[in-house]
Curated annotation (Swiss-Prot):
Cofactor-binding details, from the entry: Binds 1 NAD(+) per subunit.
Active site (catalytic residues): D121 (proton donor), E122 (proton acceptor), Y147 (proton acceptor)
Full protein name: dTDP-glucose 4,6-dehydratase
The protein's Enzyme Commission number: 4.2.1.46
Catalytic activity: dTDP-alpha-D-glucose = dTDP-4-dehydro-6-deoxy-alpha-D-glucose + H2O
Metabolic or biological pathway: Carbohydrate biosynthesis; dTDP-L-rhamnose biosynthesis
Gene Ontology BP annotations: dTDP-rhamnose biosynthetic process; polysaccharide biosynthetic process
Quaternary data: Homodimer.
Binding locations of NAD(+): 11-12, 33-36, 57-58, 77-81, 96, 147-151, 177
Signal peptide: none
Amino acid sequence: MRLLVTGGAGFIGANFVHLALREARTSSITVLDALTYAGSRESLAPVADRIRLVQGDITDAALVGDLVAESDAVVHFAAETHVDNALADPEPFLHSNVVGTYTILEAVRRHNVRLHHVSTDEVYGDLELDNPARFNETTPYNPSSPYSSTKAAADLLVRAWVRSYGVRATISNCSNNYGPYQHVEKFIPRQITNVLTGRRPKLYGAGANVRDWIHVDDHNSAVWRILTDGTIGRTYLIGAECERNNLTVMRTILKLMGRDPDDFDHVTDRAGHDLRYAIDPSTLQDELGWAPKHTDFEAGLTDTIDWYRANESWWRPLKDTVEAKYQERGQ
């Protein structure tokens, strides 16, 4: 299979490329990435001689068309993803997430190429903390941030192109990921690298917000399963049934790093901070036989901490800029 991976130099995309090559799942991989602050050549350095990396904008219709024409399938990760950045400036999110997805859809329509579109559980809004319900494939969309609204718009474009033009596409909505190569602006790597650089970890508000955590390799194994075995036009929800509130995750990280679990600062909460995300992955499990492998959250966190300890040269150049932005916001 000749595979085009958009956003393949970002966190989840780069890990997907590593997984596909590690398990010999494809004959060739082309990565299209704008290499903005969140994309890094270094994330692909271990496999650089086995892929083709093209730097370019996902909205460049001519470039995208040429790359899609050479491919048997496209996995579309490319997106702006950080909620705090979307609150400060939503325009790049509209550009990449909405116009970028439209550009991909037009290219795969023209060349009749299989597409898998990667999305987020944030399109469903949030759940009350005391509500046992979980998101499933029939949950109505109710996005609450500039980020999630652009991802919801992208999902709906994919659905419309499937129905109107017969595009061969699937969608997945996944819960919060963790693992290697995640940018230090994100919650888990921020706390790990704060400890490693002698800074105090920072927790938004009281830390009661609940997230459903999944290791990035489990997410990507599900994406591959959907790409190869999923039903065209379907949406699949990906989760590992690992709900933790942010306070618990913070204390677990500190404990695993040999620190006092209460040695952190409470900082200003995010505006409109969603309360709880929770995914019911039963359709994916029952229909496609997928199951996560990284089911021990503490073991997964330990591996992630070890990766950041061993790869300071990857994240250290990013750290000061990220923390300066957080400091400006009182976070």
